[in-house]
Amino acid sequence: MRIIFAGTPDFAARALEELQKAGLDIVLTLTQPDRPAGRGMKMQASPVKILAQQYDIPLLQPETLKSSDIQAQLATFKPDVMIVAAYGLLLPEAVLRIPRHGCINIHASLLPRWRGAAPIQRALLEGDTETGISIMQMNQGLDTGAVLLKRSLPIEPYDTTATLHDKLADLGGKCIVEALTLLDQGRLISEPQNEVDACYAAKIRKIEAEIDWTCDAAYIDRMIRTFDPHPGAFTHLQGNTIKLWQARIVSHVNHNSSHQAGKIITVDPDGIVVACGRDALSIDILQKAGGKKLTAAQFLAGHPLHPGESFHKATQDNQGASET
């Protein structure tokens, strides 16, 4: 089976690695052009490009797939199937028709739940107890194609977007190998998605990561884990932006008055306990703008805090602290 693989970030590279290990015939890899990244804004190759070069797989980096020239070039490879994983470019209908078996997508959710750009973050933020990988036949819609294979995994109470990403990337690689094996055997069954159950995972906006302390502690805890590693859940204190990276729910603390939300209840090297709309959070790891991530004990050694002080949103900050 002749395969074109299209993907860009680490999530896609792990799938490419699994396909390569399985000995499948990858005739071409597509990935986005090199982009400036990092503090020095130097041009960097994508993880998929690096891996393709490591395995000497032919590589193309088009800016778009809309041109007839690139479409004609893809057709010369006579692909049986194109595998797409977090590629980042739109696939025109003409491209979808090139492979004999069409284009198959590796999507990081249990479709039809969480179609769209940020399925991992949305599942975590909304408190889903499980997520998974859907192998989907691509069409012109946004993740609306028939599901060919689906595998689930639990979302653990300690999971962050980073840990969940890694679990799903590994699962995605295994799933696509399984799906292609079934396809080759003529045993891959497609199932249309139920539109009634569909919901969309909109792209994450930075402003969503600002903590509203009137929310309950369980939701704020999920925020902290959802926005790890990017952009980092943040709040404000004494004119400074503070990012929170790890916290624990303190359920035996009960605060019914909304004006208490964000107030520091106790200050302890083991954690800074802050009142929420319901229950409280013990902040274990935090970071001042421009600084390093610190445990509560390390932070307090250089930034003494006292019960009664309050974390709050930027709109409550007279000094107008900016986001980082």
UniProtKB/Swiss-Prot annotation:
SUPFAM superfamilies (alphabetical): FMT C-terminal domain-like, Formyltransferase
Residues bound to (6S)-5,6,7,8-tetrahydrofolate: S109, L110, L111, P112
Keyword check for Protein biosynthesis: yes
Region (Disordered) location: 305-324
Catalysed reactions listed for this entry: L-methionyl-tRNA(fMet) + (6R)-10-formyltetrahydrofolate = N-formyl-L-methionyl-tRNA(fMet) + (6S)-5,6,7,8-tetrahydrofolate + H(+)
EC number: 2.1.2.9
Cross-referenced Pfam families: Formyl_trans_C, Formyl_trans_N
Lineage top rank: taxon: Bacteria
Keyword list, A-Z: Protein biosynthesis, Transferase
GO molecular function, one term: methionyl-tRNA formyltransferase activity
Matching InterPro entries: Fmt, Formyl_trans_C, Formyl_trans_C_sf, Formyl_transf_N, Formyl_transf_N_sf, Formyl_transferase-like_C_sf, Met-tRNA-FMT_C, Met-tRNA-FMT_N
Record's keyword annotation contains Protein biosynthesis: yes
Annotated GO CC locations: cytosol
Family membership: Belongs to the Fmt family.
Role of this protein: Attaches a formyl group to the free amino group of methionyl-tRNA(fMet). The formyl group appears to play a dual role in the initiator identity of N-formylmethionyl-tRNA by promoting its recognition by IF2 and preventing the misappropriation of this tRNA by the elongation apparatus.
PANTHER family referenced in this protein's UniProt entry, alphabetically: METHIONYL-TRNA FORMYLTRANSFERASE, METHIONYL-TRNA FORMYLTRANSFERASE, MITOCHONDRIAL
Protein's recorded name: Methionyl-tRNA formyltransferase
Classification of source organism: Bacteria, Pseudomonadati, Pseudomonadota, Betaproteobacteria, Nitrosomonadales
Encoding gene (name): fmt
